Amino acid sequence: MSTTRRTLLKGAASSSLIAAMPSIVTAQTAATAATVAPARANVLRCVMHADLASLDPIATTASITQYHGALIYDTLFGHDSDAVVRPQMVAEHKVSADGLTYDFTLRPGLAFHDGSKVTAKDCAASVKRWGARDGAGQHLFKQVADVSANGDNSMVIKLSKPYPALLDWLGKSSPSVCYMMREKDATSDPSRPITEAIGSGPYMFNRAETRTGSQYVYDRNPNYKPRSEAASGFAGGKVARMQRIVFQNMPDEQTAISALLAGEVDFLERTSPDLRSQLAGNNRVRTEVLNKTGQIGWLRMNCLQAPFNNAKARQAMLHLIDQKAVMQATYGDPTNYRGCGSLFGCGTTMENDANTAWFKGGQNIARATALFKESGYDGRPVVIMQQTTSPVLSNASLLLAQWLRQAGVNAQLVPLDWAGIVARRANKGPVAEGGWGIFLTWASGSAYNNPITLAGHAATGDKGWFGWPEDARHEQLRDAWVQAPSVDARKKIARDLQENAWNFVPHAYLGQWFDVAAMRSDVKGLIGLADLVPFWNVSRG
């Protein structure tokens, strides 16, 4: 099979996206009413990696929705550039001597975009909603006895057992971030996306100027009071220097490159190597790797349905994938990528080589074929949801289908944009009922380092993240890891986790790559985070 290193894709917004966001073009609030358009110099136009399919950063782990959340919401805590957790909306906090009670006092002057005051009731409800949905939150809430308000400005979390990572999880920037919402939004079912977008963060969502599938507009919140500290990582003062931020949807990368060169847009989150050459030598633009930990592509299998409800079929996927071929198909230059066999990602603290003979041995179609046979595979269709809006995942899907067919599997590609995948991956049923067999996605390289905060590291069955693997030993080891007294102790448990995981196989990896962003030369102040692109602190000129 011949695969090019670039897949250019065009398309309009899907009907599933429109259905997911029914109020975007109809609902209005005082905070988002149409305003006089700011001067072009005060607007940052950004082309992101995907269209915004959902407004709810708790209901979905989609990275683009987390970016949206970072603009309009705020958090109780955040990690600075040295990975130290710092207070954000919190003025001060106290922990009882036994480690079971946490008391948080909010900063004065916090207000939502609709003018209402941020209260401890809002925060308590937000923490509960996050805890019911997020992987780290679910793990934490196994030890939470109560979360409640103690007056307007104080929130109390009571634990049944000490949990050393509580503040870290409240301040993490990996999906899903623990964003603070209004109580009336936060008390809704966390599995059903909210359609309101009213937070207390540095930018306000402008529904009047938003065009679903085309552009999403955020205006500076004139009432936001940033912290006095300098911006650092996901912490410090979130200063909205630009009057307006616009997420511009441009699926065709050549169109986006041309728009950047013409000054019609200011920032491209990702550029492919073959198109990036058009930017070389042009002093009006520059490129930068913002996420130094890279991205790791992975595939999730529907562990509730055959054939992947059998561990043998999942083991087959480890032997089936040639990570170098997947990366070569899109990135070409090997300096842009590498293979990775560690459950915890490569270049991370917890990286290890336990139980990686399958990776060191390279692709083995014959072994994969034998394992599918041992699993009892009966020839039924295995649907691969091919993400058409990502060149690397689209190319990987094509290769994966080819390799599965070589292993005797009836692989069927179903092309979908990201919004379509987000909608369909929630279906736990068989293919005949709209289900699926495999979908491909990615996460920041740093996200894999932590077996608690990455939702896909859980093995809690149908209560967990899409794919729904289940393994009791894995969950016991995750519990032990979070309670471990030192980094060295965690590293030892990480080896045990990986040894066990590559036997039951919760997912499989496609390789690790390093995205290069491009921007106009006058764009200043971008903060490089591993998990999202924040746009506070950014200016032009």
Regions of interest found by a model, annotated:
Residues 212-214, 252-253, 271-273, 337, ...:
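Ligand/substrate-recognition segments at binding pockets and active sites
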Residues 278, 304, 308-348, 395-396, ...:
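Periplasmic-binding protein-like
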Residues 37, 359-362, 412-426, 452-521, ...:
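Extracytoplasmic/peripheral linker and loop segments enriched in polar/acidic and small residues
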Residues 203-204, 335-374, 390-395:
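Structural transition elements
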Residues 139-186, 191-211:
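Surface-exposed binding/hinge segments that line
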